[in-house]
Amino acid sequence: MEDPNRMLAHTGGMMAPQGYGLSGQDDGQNAGSENEVRKQKDIGEILQQIMSISEQSLDEAQARKHTLNCHRMKPALFSVLCEIKEKTVLSIRNTQEEEPPDPQLMRLDNMLIAEGVAGPEKGGGGAAAASAAAASQGGSLSIDGADNAIEHSDYRAKLAQIRQIYHQELEKYEQACNEFTTHVMNLLREQSRTRPITPKEIERMVQIIHKKFSSIQMQLKQSTCEAVMILRSRFLDARRKRRNFSKQASEILNEYFYSHLSNPYPSEEAKEELARKCGITVSQVSNWFGNKRIRYKKNIGKAQEEANLYAAKKAAGASPYSMAGPPSGTTTPMMSPAPPQDSMGYPMGSGGYDQQQPYDNSMGGYDPNLHQDLSP
């Protein structure tokens, strides 16, 4: 019978390989897990380095670039990137098509050129002002040429101010666009030393940048066009308002009209005198009296109040705008001829003297009591 200690030792010797085999599997699993941990750690370090790029100083970034460019594996890295690019560039090659110009931007450009804001300054503002003045006058003569000249110069001055602001803002826009484009192009050229970037891709990126900036340019041109249209509308409205007679001219014409209600048809000599005093033409005087007679007949009540007002003014004192009144006789209802008068200046009725009244020169030949019962 053998010694148990020898058998134990022998058994231990036999069991040893089995125990060694199990520990080998455990060591392989541990080595694989260690590799995974190491890979994750490396990825984490790479991500940390990428995140720290934005915090690096310019000197540190230049040092890292120099280290990368001098690395012995840099050509291999560039070759791999070129292979990847050849595979991916085929899918995006067909998407790079030329886009037509924006029609809205073209319309804005044409409008700014027509208004004399864009393009070379060749009197475009003056031409626009002249056309606006002609459209506002509508074929009628201006009442005050000096005022029209002043307004015309104001329009051109404001249009020149709009033009100046537009060109200043456009210059700022173009400067910002050029600076940003130059920065991106330099950045892409710098990156082309590490990754493959073709000149066509750089040109494509420039086009994308200009398209982004075109929205700012469109807003600038749109606001400028709106400012020009507002200026034109205000100028045209002002021109239309100037077609009305001045207060002095209205006073002269109304005073003559109500002083001659018996025969509100001024002679050619009177029209010329009125036109001279009012600073208007004879045809405008004729048109005014024609319109005044129609308005008086349609609204006799309101016209009667206005007639009383002018009669009171004349009773208080002679107006500086007044002309010579009628030679004699009292007024009669509107649109009726004056009745015949005798040698004493009294109206003659069919049956002789009709309510003989002395002639009141203070009223200018007009008695408001005779027109209280007039019907339209």
UniProtKB/Swiss-Prot annotation:
Belongs to the TALE/PBX homeobox family. Residues 1-37, 318-376 are annotated as: Disordered. Gene3D superfamilies: Homeodomain-like (1.10.10.60). InterPro entries: HD, Homeobox_CS, Homeodomain-like_sf, KN_HD, PBX_PBC_dom, TALE_homeobox. Residues 38-237 form the PBC domain. GO terms for biological process: animal organ morphogenesis; brain development; embryonic organ development; eye development; neuron development; oenocyte development; peripheral nervous system development; positive regulation of DNA-templated transcription. Pfam families: Homeobox_KN, PBC. SUPFAM superfamilies: Homeodomain-like. It is found in: Nucleus. The lineage of its organism: Eukaryota, Metazoa, Ecdysozoa, Arthropoda, Hexapoda. SMART domains: HOX. Disruption phenotype: Weak posterior-directed transformations in all 3 thoracic segments and in the anterior segments of the abdomen. Residues 127-237 are annotated as: PBC-B. Residues 318-335 have a biased composition (Low complexity). Residues 45-124 are annotated as: PBC-A. GO terms for molecular function: cis-regulatory region sequence-specific DNA binding; DNA binding; DNA-binding transcription factor activity; DNA-binding transcription factor activity, RNA polymerase II-specific; DNA-binding transcription factor binding; protein heterodimerization activity; sequence-specific DNA binding; transcription coactivator activity. Keywords: Developmental protein, DNA-binding, Homeobox, Nucleus, Transcription, Transcription regulation. It comes from Drosophila melanogaster. Prior to full germband retraction it is ubiquitously present, after germband retraction, mostly present in the anterior portion of the ventral nerve cord. Residues 238-300 bind DNA. The gene is exd. This is Homeobox protein extradenticle. Interacts with Ubx and hth. GO terms for cellular component: cytoplasm; nucleus; protein-DNA complex; RNA polymerase II transcription regulator complex; transcription regulator complex. Transcription factor which acts with the selector homeodomain proteins altering the regulation of downstream target genes such as wingless (wg), teashirt (tsh) and decapentaplegic (dpp), thus affecting segmental identity. Delimits the eye field and prevent inappropriate eye development. Required for proper localization of chordotonal organs within the peripheral nervous system. Its main location: nucleus.
